Amino acid sequence: MITDVQLAIFSNVLGVFLFLLVVAYHYINANTGKPIPKAK
């Protein structure tokens, strides 16, 4: 059976992983695709 401490650790690790996944998705999405024209 899963104890309260194990459940808390699992949920915290899962939350951090999902948060970092969202941050990485936004970072990759914002920095790819549209090339920025260079100012002369």
From Swiss-Prot:
Query: What kind of membrane protein is this, topologically?
Result: Single-pass type III membrane protein
Q: Which residues lie on this side of the membrane: Cytoplasmic?
A: 26-40
Question: Where does this polypeptide localize?
Answer: Endoplasmic reticulum membrane
GO annotation, cellular component aspect = oligosaccharyltransferase complex
Which superkingdom? Answer: Eukaryota
Q: Which residues cross the membrane?
A: 5-25
Residues in compartment: Lumenal: 1-4
Report if keyword Transmembrane helix is assigned: yes
Record Pfam families? Ost4 (PF10215)
List the cysteine pairs that form cystine.
none
Q: What is the protein's quaternary organization?
A: Component of the oligosaccharyltransferase (OST) complex.
Instruction: Describe the task this protein carries out.
Output: Subunit of the oligosaccharyl transferase (OST) complex that catalyzes the initial transfer of a defined glycan (Glc(3)Man(9)GlcNAc(2) in eukaryotes) from the lipid carrier dolichol-pyrophosphate to an asparagine residue within an Asn-X-Ser/Thr consensus motif in nascent polypeptide chains, the first step in protein N-glycosylation. N-glycosylation occurs cotranslationally and the complex associates with the Sec61 complex at the channel-forming translocon complex that mediates protein translocation across the endoplasmic reticulum (ER). All subunits are required for a maximal enzyme activity.
Would you identify the family this protein belongs to, as annotated? Answer: Belongs to the OST4 family.
Q: What is this protein called?
A: Dolichyl-diphosphooligosaccharide--protein glycosyltransferase subunit 4
Source organism per UniProt: Drosophila ananassae
